[in-house]
C-alpha cells in the first residue's frame, strides 16, 4: 500500500478506536505537579489488563512518528492514543522556569562527588521511532531522538550494543544499537537497527554545539557484545567520534593505575563533574567489566544498583526498604521503568496503570531519598516528571524584586527573599549533619551564627541534602541558604 494511503488508513483506525472509548478522568497529583493523562487513558479505563492498550498505543505512536517523518507538520500528527510530540512543546520548555531550574540544579551539583550526584536519564534512550522504523523501534521506550532528549536536560543516556551480521557489510558483523535479547538468544529482536558509528555522532554533535560545550554526560553502554572483535570496534568508534573539531577527545578515560583484578577500572565515585570538566572531558562511559573496552569504559557493576522497588517507594525518609541509608551513601542507585509491549506481554495480568512506572508523584520521593540516576521511558518536556525532579526553586522563582537572598521555605522549596529579613540559617557541621541557628538572623549574620554552633553556613547541593535540611528547617518555618542571586 502506498505510504500516504497507509498513513490515512492508520489514522482513521486510531480515530475510530478513540470514538468508541469514553475519555478517562485525570487523577489529582499529590505533589501538585501538572501532568497530562496517559496517551492511552481512554483505553485504560475499560481494559482490565495492560496488553491491549499498550499495543494500541504502540501502533498509534508508530503512525504518528511516520507522519512526522514524511514532513507533515507535527501538530497534525498528534493522534488518539499516541504520545504528543511537537517542536512547540520543546521550544516552550526551553523558555520555562523548569528548564532554568534544572540547569541551576546541575550547576549546584558540579562540585559534588558522583556518589551523591543526581542525573536525569532515560532508559533505552536510543529505542525511538524518531529516526527510523524497525521491529524493535516499533516497541519504543522513547519518542524523542538522543539530541532532543539532551535538549530537555537529560544528561544520562543508555545505548544497548549488539554484534550482528550486517546487510551493508555483506554479512560481516557490526556493532549495532538495538533493543533485543543477547547473543545466547541469537540477538532476537534486532533486525536493521543502526550501527553505533551512526548513532554516536548525534551525541558528539550535541556536545560540540554552541551552548553545550561545557556539559558533562553519563553514557551507559549495555554490553550484549561478548566478542573480542566487537569490543575493539566499540573503542575505535568511541575514539573516532567522541572528539572536538580540533581533534581533542571528549572521553573521561579510566586511570590504569586504578585497574582492579578483573582487568577493569571501577567508576570512581569520589570524582565530581567539576573535576571531569577540568580534565577536558565531557563524556563518562560506563558499563559492565570487559577488558576489551576497559581503556575507555568504566566498570560500574560493583558500584551501581538497580534492583529496588518502584511500586513500593515511599516519601522521605521511608524511601525504599530494599536499601538502607548506607547504600545511598556509597553506591550509585538507579531506578528505571519499561513501557514496552514486550514487558507487558511478560506480565499478562498487569493492570493498565503500571505499578513500576516512574510517575510524577514518585519522582520527588526518589529525589529526596538520594536516587542518583533515573531511567525514564517516553520522557517528554510537558509530562511532569522533569518538574517533579526539581527540589530547589519553587515555581517561577526567583521572582524579580523579591530580594537577593535565597530562603528555603517551610515547604522545602526555595524562594527569593529580602536579605534584611530575620530567619534561621541553614548550617552543616563537619560530619554532614544539618541544623538551623537557634535564633533568626539577617542573611549577613548567618555565617557567624552558624560558626557559633560549630557549623558552616552553606546550601544544599542535592535533593537529598535539601530534604535533610528541610527535616530540621521546616518546623522552624524555613531557613536561609547560602546563595545570593547574581546582580
From Swiss-Prot:
Transmembrane residue ranges: 10-30, 45-65, 439-459
Localization: Cell membrane
Any single GO CC term annotated in Swiss-Prot or TrEMBL for this entry: plasma membrane
UniProt membrane topology term: Multi-pass membrane protein
Highest rank taxon of the organism: Bacteria
Assigned keywords, A-Z: Cell membrane, Membrane, Transmembrane, Transmembrane helix
Molecular function terms from GO: phosphoric diester hydrolase activity
GO BP field: lipid metabolic process
Name of the protein this chain belongs to: Uncharacterized protein MT2135
Amino acid at each position: 500500500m502506498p505510504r500516504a494511503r497507509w498513513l490515512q488508513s492508520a489514522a482513521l483506525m486510531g480515530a475510530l478506536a478513540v470514538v468508541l472509548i469514553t475519555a478517562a478522568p485525570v487523577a489529582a497529583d499529590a505533589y501538585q505537579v501538572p501532568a497530562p493523562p496517559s496517551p492511552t487513558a481512554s483505553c485504560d479505563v475499560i481494559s482490565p489488563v495492560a496488553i491491549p492498550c499498550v499495543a494500541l498505543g504502540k501502533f498509534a505512536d508508530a503512525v504518528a512518528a511516520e507522519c512526522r517523518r514524511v514532513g507533515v507538520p507535527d501538530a497534525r500528527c498528534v493522534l488518539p492514543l499516541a504520545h504528543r510530540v511537537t517542536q512547540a512543546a520543546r521550544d516552550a520548555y526551553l523558555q520555562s522556569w523548569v528548564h532554568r531550574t534544572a540547569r541551576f540544579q546541575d550547576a549546584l551539583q558540579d562540585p559534588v562527588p558522583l556518589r551523591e550526584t543526581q542525573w536525569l536519564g532515560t532508559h533505552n534512550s536510543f529505542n525511538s521511532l524518531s529516526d527510523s522504523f524497525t521491529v524493535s523501534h516499533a516497541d519504543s521506550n522513547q519518542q524523542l531522538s538522543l539530541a532532543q532528549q539532551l535538549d530537555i536536560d537529560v544528561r544520562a543516556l543508555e545505548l544497548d550494543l549488539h554484534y550482528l551480521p550486517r546487510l551493508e557489510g555483506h554479512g560481516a558483523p557490526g556493532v549495532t544499537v538495538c533493543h533485543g535479547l543477547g547473543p545466547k538468544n541469537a540477538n532476537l529482536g534486532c533486525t536493521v537497527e543502526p550501527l553505533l558509528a551512526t548513532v554516536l555522532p548525534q551525541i558528539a554533535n550535541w556536545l560540540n554545539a554552541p551552548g553545550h560545550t561545557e556539559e558533562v554526560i553519563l553514557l551507559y553502554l549495555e554490553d550484549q557484545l561478548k566478542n573480542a572483535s566487537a569490543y575493539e570496534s566499540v573503542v575505535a568508534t568511541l575514539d573516532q567520534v567522541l572528539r572536538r573539531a580540533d581533534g581533542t577527545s571528549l572521553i573521561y578515560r579510566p586511570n590504569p593505575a586504578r585497574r582492579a583484578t578483573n582487568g577493569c577500572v571501577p567508576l570512581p565515585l569520589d570524582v565530581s563533574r567539576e573535576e571531569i570538566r577540568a580534565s577536558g572531558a565531557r563524556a563518562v562511559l560506563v558499563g559492565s567489566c570487559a577488558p576489551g573496552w576497559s581503556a575507555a569504559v568504566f566498570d560500574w557493576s560493583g558500584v551501581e544498583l538497580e534492583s529496588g522497588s518502584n511500586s513500593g517507594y515511599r516519601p522521605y525518609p521511608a524511601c525504599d526498604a530494599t536499601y538502607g541509608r548506607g547504600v545511598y551513601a556509597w553506591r550509585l542507585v538507579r531506578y528505571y521503568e519499561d513501557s514496552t509491549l514486550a514487558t507487558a506481554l511478560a506480565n499478562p495480568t498487569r493492570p493498565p496503570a503500571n505499578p513500576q512506572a516512574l510517575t510524577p508523584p514518585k519522582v520527588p520521593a526518589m529525589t529526596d531519598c538520594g536516587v542518583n540516576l533515573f531511567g525514564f521511558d517516553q520522557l517528554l518536556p510537558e509530562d511532569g516528571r522533569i518538574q517533579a525532579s526539581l527540589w530547589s526553586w519553587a515555581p517561577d522563582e526567583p521572582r524579580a524584586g523579591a530580594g537577593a537572598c535565597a530562603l528555603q521555605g517551610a515547604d522545602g522549596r526555595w524562594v527569593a527573599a529580602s536579605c534584611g529579613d530575620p530567619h534561621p540559617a541553614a548550617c552543616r557541621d563537619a560530619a554532614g549533619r544539618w541544623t538551623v541557628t537557634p535564633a533568626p538572623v539577617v542573611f549577613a549574620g548567618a555565617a557567624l551564627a552558624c560558626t557559633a554552633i560549630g557549623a558552616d553556613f552553606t546550601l544544599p547541593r542535592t535533593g537529598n541534602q535539601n530534604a535533610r535540611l528541610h527535616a530540621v528547617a521546616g518546623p522552624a518555618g524555613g531557613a536561609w541558604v547560602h546563595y545570593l542571586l547574581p546582580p
